[in-house]
Amino acid sequence: MAVISMKQLLEAGVHFGHQTRRWNPKMKKYIFTERNGIYIIDLQKTVKKVEEAYNFIKQVSEDGGRVLFVGTKKQAQESVKAEAERAGQFYVNQRWLGGILTNYKTISKRIKRISEIEKMEEDGLFDVLPKKEVVELKKEYDRLIKFLGGIRDMKSMPQALFVVDPRKERNAIAEARKLNIPIVGIVDTNCDPDEIDYVIPANDDAIRAVKLLTGKMADAVLEGQQGVSNDEVAAEQNINLDEKEESQEAESTEENTTVESN
């Protein structure tokens, strides 16, 4: 069964590219035709590319890896947050702060500040501090959560990056490429596909299209996690089986020894 259907893609408007005057010639192989000055993306290729990206993300997840979802344009913000959270992954859906990947040591200090402020409130310090200072602390906290809340539990580098619109997320892509982190991306007709390891040729401006494709990548993560769970259960069952066999062998040996001595 295909990961995604042509019907789903058509209904979400995935096939609508940019105006013909705003295009990247490198995307030519993913374009089906032109209609009323708009490029139409070849959805047969999109179906195939979604499957390739899905299988890659699934494997990353199955191997115990984590995915960082990135989409800071308005059309992507809600879907990126919702789908990343659904799959238990990291996300950045506001402005990309330089160094999130390449200077994580510094970024992690700012993330630590989130917990510090939370502890101050839990310990009742907000009740004794001057009101003005509490207001400033709350503003700082809200700002940190807004920009770093989606990566506050990211203790090490992700094993894959999923981006919506490579043009918009060029800084995130540059950092990922420096660290050789594979990139999956929704790539419209005005983008450079060479920057992306797993290209999903699609409309990156329609909310429904972005939600559909981001959701499929989250599904891939969840399916991979299910594979991990199944493997862990199988491994545990094998261990229990081995222990049972060893126990039975020991009992058998003990019985034989008793018989021989009698």
From Swiss-Prot:
Ranges of Acidic residues composition bias in the record: 243-254
GO biological process, one term: translation
Record-level Gene Ontology MF annotations: structural constituent of ribosome
Keyword presence, Ribosomal protein: yes
InterPro entries: Ribosomal_uS2 (IPR001865), Ribosomal_uS2_bac/mit/plastid (IPR005706), Ribosomal_uS2_CS (IPR018130), Ribosomal_uS2_flav_dom_sf (IPR023591)
Classification via CDD domains: RPS2
Domain of life: Bacteria
Pfam families: Ribosomal_S2 (PF00318)
Region (Disordered): 240-262
GO cellular component: cytosolic small ribosomal subunit
Keywords assigned by UniProt, alphabetized: Ribonucleoprotein, Ribosomal protein
HAMAP family, A to Z: Ribosomal_uS2_B
NCBIfam families: rpsB_bact
Family note: Belongs to the universal ribosomal protein uS2 family.
Protein name (record): Small ribosomal subunit protein uS2
Organism from which the protein derives: Staphylococcus haemolyticus (strain JCSC1435)
